[in-house]
């Protein structure tokens, strides 16, 4: 089972998607693909930042996010107490406290493989990961 990193979910929104990512997702069972609430937050942050620059794009992105949340509704994993504790442990060991570390903690707690292009962000966490862009 898999946890999509923000970079992979964002790739799926693009008009000219990476064919390897599309192929990978087509081969995965929808019930085996999850999102982290952290990814939703990262995209929301991008929407808010875009509003001042390009309101139309921000609105389109928000509509896409709303649809994505509906599709993944029962497969969006929260940052609950076990995830927060795992994140705290990873953060103390690695010396990082970013969003990718929360995503790694979520995957570790749920026994998921992170699907990402940013493999270097996950290498030190001990989480399993794959790069569908290759």
Regions found by a protein language model. Name each.
Residues 45-50, 59, 70-117:
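Active-site neighborhoods of divalent-metal-dependent phosphate/nucleic-acid chemistry enzymes
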Residues 37-38, 80, 118, 133:
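Residues at the C-termini of beta-strands that transition into short coil/loop
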Residues 1-35, 39, 49-67, 134:
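Short, well-structured N-terminal submotif of metal-dependent ribonuclease cores
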Residues 3, 113-116, 123:
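Nucleic acid-binding interface residues in structured DNA/RNA-binding domains
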